[in-house]
Structure formats: structure tokens, C-alpha cells
């Protein structure tokens, strides 16, 4: 009797295989932590199938393993394909299959274990911006050949700013440079850079913009992978040249910029030509033109002598006279052409020489002008910038004078 009662109780409380499986599936698939879980491990095996990519992820010591699947529609979205022997971090959810009594991880994303989430976010943003066409070569704009005003966005305390100033002054004296300071490292950097670019656009004078900073660790350059900064560069109304760091990975700002170089100095060299190099190129062209003219003249003289010899052999006075007149006309025409081109070349060279002289700040000072600087070294361009009592440094053609403002008159 007792045995029958015990058997009846067990039978009433016993679960079927499907009942137990359904219960376990509810526990696994409805657990919030298991619906989106990151798992790190080593890929021990892979199997490519028409329906998807199947692989096993295990601990390095082999003490535990889990089967994983990436369905075919999701495979192209993976940042890293599973390869046997490699360490991966995968993102997925737990699924239980009643027929086999097995559970496995349905994977949505996989990244190398040594790179982590930051690389994943970088790749996802890069793919999204690429799909929008922000990196298309057709979007790249040409830089102005001879800009009169450029803007620079960087930190006022960075060595990059000094390198850019030195390069611009050496290559293109007289250039007007607008400086829009920004923080280029840390959490506040993206917003600061976006505001600095906006200031340049609002000012409206710059023809090209340099966005730059010196070298640094990858984490220090994170602001140049920020979506806000990337879109600000992409939407900028003037061409943008980036010069970020010396040895670094490619940043998203580099990809979207119109021109990308590796250093602040190289960025400055990109936006302006070297007047000295231009002058030398023009001299070389004049020399080449002179050589061409000499060659043409020599060739014509040789041809003329050949014709003379032929005419002498023909002994036809009338024909000789006609040919002599024709050759004389050709000679006069050649001389006129040679003199004309030579004069044009001289005028062009003189124009370049005068332009170089006019761009030389010392030449301007020799004509009686002066450069007035405030105590902080900034050039005073308007009486509005000055106040009574300010000390000024006046640079003349010969020497420098220190003065103090005793009265300020506003121009009506």
C-alpha cells in the first residue's frame, strides 16, 4: 500500500522531457542577462554551412565549451570572422533546442579579444559613415592654389600650433592666419573642436582650414573618431586638411577630410605653396624657353643655309631672288617672334620679382609703414582694440620703439 502511494506521488510530480526542456528554455531565453551577453573564449573549431557559420568557443584550458552559430544574414556584419585558435569576444543570446536537448549561443557580433569594444564601436561607426558616402573620393575638394586667408583649429598650447606658424611664415609670408583654439584631448575635446570649426565658418574669411594636433597615444586621439567631429568636418563649407599625430592608426576625421597628412608641418605645407619654389620654377621655365628659341633659330638658320646652297646650285637668278625674299621674310618673322617671346618672359620675371618684393614685410616697412604690436604680441589692427595706458611696441624699418597710448580716437 505504501509503495503504491509513493509511486502515485512520484508519477504526479514527475516532469516529461519536453516539460523539463520547456522549463529550462524559459529560464535561459527569458533571463535578461542571457538575452544579450558578451562571452570571451578561444575558437576551437569552425564549420561553414549554407544557413550560417557554426563554431565552438571554449576556455583556453579546455575546461568548458559552448556551441555558437552566426546565421548567414549576420555573417557580413561581423567585425572579425571566427578562426580556429584565435581569441574572440562575441555578443549573442542563449537559445535552447528541445529536439537535441542542447543550448547554444546565437551570435550577432564578434571582435578580437585583444581589441575590445572600442574597436567595435569604431568599426560600426566607420561602416555607417561609409554607407552614407562620407568617405567617397568624389566629395574631396581641391585646395585653393594661392589662399590669402586660412584658419587653424588646434590647441593654443600644443607644439602643433608653433610648427604650423613657423612653416606658413617661411613658405608664404604675408598670409593671413585665423586661429580658432580648441581642446584636442579628453572628454570635452569633441564639442570644443566642433565649436572651433563653427567659429571659422561664421567668420567667413578663411579659404581653407587646418585641423591638427601633435602625436599621442590612441586613446588621446579618440576625439578624432567622434561622430560629431567627423560630421563637422564633412559639413564644413571650405576644404579641410588634417595633420594629426606622427605615428598613428587612421582616424575617421582623416578619412572624411579633403586632404590628410601625417604631421602639422605637412598640413601647413599642403595649404600654401612656397614662393621661393615658385620663383625658381618660373626661372627654370624662362631658361627652357630661351633654349627652345635658340634651338628654333639655329634650326632655321641651318635650313636657310641649305636653301641657299640649293639655289646656288640651280643658278637661276630669278628663282634665287624669290627664294631669298621669302627666306628674308621668314628670318624677320622669326626675329620678331623671338624678341616678342623674350620680352614677355622678361616682363613675367619682373612681375614675379615685384610681387615677391611687395610680399616682403621689410619692404613694406621701408616705405614708411610700421607694425604695431600689443603687450601680448598681437598685431593691433584697429583703435577699437586699444585703450588709454596700453603699452605698444612699434616695429620700424630700422629698430623698434616702445610707446604708450595716451588717447584713442575712433574713426567715424
Curated annotation (Swiss-Prot):
Q: Which Pfam families match?
A: Exonuc_VII_L, tRNA_anti_2
Q: Which UniProt keyword terms apply here? A: Cytoplasm, Exonuclease, Hydrolase, Nuclease
Q: Point out the coiled-coil segments of this chain.
A: none
**Compartments in which it is found:** Cytoplasm
* The keyword tRNA processing belongs to this UniProt entry's keyword annotation: no
The record's top EC class is hydrolase
Q: Name one GO molecular function term.
A: exodeoxyribonuclease VII activity
GO cellular component, as recorded: cytoplasm; exodeoxyribonuclease VII complex
Q: Which reaction does it catalyse?
A: Exonucleolytic cleavage in either 5'- to 3'- or 3'- to 5'-direction to yield nucleoside 5'-phosphates
EC number(s) per entry: 3.1.11.6
One GO-annotated biological process of the protein = DNA catabolic process
Q: Give the chief site where it resides.
A: cytoplasm
Q: Its quaternary structure?
A: Heterooligomer composed of large and small subunits.
State its role: Bidirectionally degrades single-stranded DNA into large acid-insoluble oligonucleotides, which are then degraded further into small acid-soluble oligonucleotides.
Q: Which family does it belong to?
A: Belongs to the XseA family.
What name appears for this protein in its UniProt entry?
Answer: Exodeoxyribonuclease 7 large subunit
Q: Which gene encodes it?
A: xseA
Amino acid at each position: 500500500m505504501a509503495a503504491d502511494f509513493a509511486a502515485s506521488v512520484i508519477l504526479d510530480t514527475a516532469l516529461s522531457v519536453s516539460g523539463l526542456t520547456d522549463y529550462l528554455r524559459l529560464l535561459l531565453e527569458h533571463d535578461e542577462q542571457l538575452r544579450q551577453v558578451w562571452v570571451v573564449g578561444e575558437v576551437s573549431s569552425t564549420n561553414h554551412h549554407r544557413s550560417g557559420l557554426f563554431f565552438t568557443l571554449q576556455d583556453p584550458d579546455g575546461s568548458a565549451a559552448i556551441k555558437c552559430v552566426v546565421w548567414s544574414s549576420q555573417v557580413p556584419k561581423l567585425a572579425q570572422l571566427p578562426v580556429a585558435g584565435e581569441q574572440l569576444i562575441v555578443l549573442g543570446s542563449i537559445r535552447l533546442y528541445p529536439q537535441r536537448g542542447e543550448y547554444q549561443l546565437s551570435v550577432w557580433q564578434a571582435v578580437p579579444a585583444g581589441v575590445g569594444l572600442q574597436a567595435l564601436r569604431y568599426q560600426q561607426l566607420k561602416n555607417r559613415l561609409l554607407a552614407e558616402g562620407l568617405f567617397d573620393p568624389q566629395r574631396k575638394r581641391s585646395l585653393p592654389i594661392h589662399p590669402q586667408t586660412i584658419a587653424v583649429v588646434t590647441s593654443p598650447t600644443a607644439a602643433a600650433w608653433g610648427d604650423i606658424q613657423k612653416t606658413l611664415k617661411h613658405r608664404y609670408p604675408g598670409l593671413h592666419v585665423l586661429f580658432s583654439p580648441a581642446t584636442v584631448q579628453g572628454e570635452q575635446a569633441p564639442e570644443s573642436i566642433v565649436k572651433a570649426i563653427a567659429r571659422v565658418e561664421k567668420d567667413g574669411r578663411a579659404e581653407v582650414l587646418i585641423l591638427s594636433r601633435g602625436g599621442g597615444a590612441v586613446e588621446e586621439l579618440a576625439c578624432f573618431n567622434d561622430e560629431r567631429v567627423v560630421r563637422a568636418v564633412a559639413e564644413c563649407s571650405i576644404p579641410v586638411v588634417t595633420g594629426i599625430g606622427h605615428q598613428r592608426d587612421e582616424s575617421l576625421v582623416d578619412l572624411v577630410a579633403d586632404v590628410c597628412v601625417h604631421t602639422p608641418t605637412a598640413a601647413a605645407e599642403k595649404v600654401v605653396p612656397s614662393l621661393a619654389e615658385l620663383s625658381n620654377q618660373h626661372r627654370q621655365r624662362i631658361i627652357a624657353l630661351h633654349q627652345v628659341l635658340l634651338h628654333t633659330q639655329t634650326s632655321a638658320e641651318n635650313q636657310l643655309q641649305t636653301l641657299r646652297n640649293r639655289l646656288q646650285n640651280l643658278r637661276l637668278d630669278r628663282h634665287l631672288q624669290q627664294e631669298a625674299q621669302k627666306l628674308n621674310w621668314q628670318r624677320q618673322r622669326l626675329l620678331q617672334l623671338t624678341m616678342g617671346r623674350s620680352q614677355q618672359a622678361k616682363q613675367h620675371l619682373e612681375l614675379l620679382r615685384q610681387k615677391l618684393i611687395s610680399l616682403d614685410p621689410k619692404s613694406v616697412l621701408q616705405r614708411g609703414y610700421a607694425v604695431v604690436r600689443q603687450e601680448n604680441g598681437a598685431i593691433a589692427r584697429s583703435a577699437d582694440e586699444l585703450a588709454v595706458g596700453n603699452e605698444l611696441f612699434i616695429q620700424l624699418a630700422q629698430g623698434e620703439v616702445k610707446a604708450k597710448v595716451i588717447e584713442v580716437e575712433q574713426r567715424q
